[in-house]
Amino acid sequence: MNELKALYIIVNAGFASEIVDIARSLGSTGATIINARGSVAKPKTILGITIDTEKEIVLSVVKKEVALKIMQKVKEKAGVGTPAHGLCFFLPVEMSTLTIHEQPIED
C-alpha cells in the first residue's frame, strides 16, 4: 500500500526556510518552495489599491507518518497564531518516480 503523501505547507513570505528546516529535522529529504499570493475575504487596501498577501508554499513528498509529525511541529512552531501563519494539508500520491520501481505498472 502506497503511503506517500504530498504535503503542502502555506506560510507568509519569508518563512519557507524555517519550514524546510523543520521538515528535514523530521525526515523529509527535500522540498520545493513556490512563491504565491494569498486571497482573503476582506482584502487590505491602501489609497484604494488592493494589497496582495505574499505567501510561500512548501511542497514535500513524504511518508504519511513523517507528514503527520511535520504537520504537528509546524502547528506548534509556525501555525496560524504565529507570524508565519502556517497552514498544512496533505493529499495522497498515487504514483511517482520515487516509487515506480517498487510497484509494477499495469495497463
List each model region and its residues.
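Positively charged, small/polar-rich N-terminal and surface patches that mediate targeting and assembly
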Residues: M1-D107
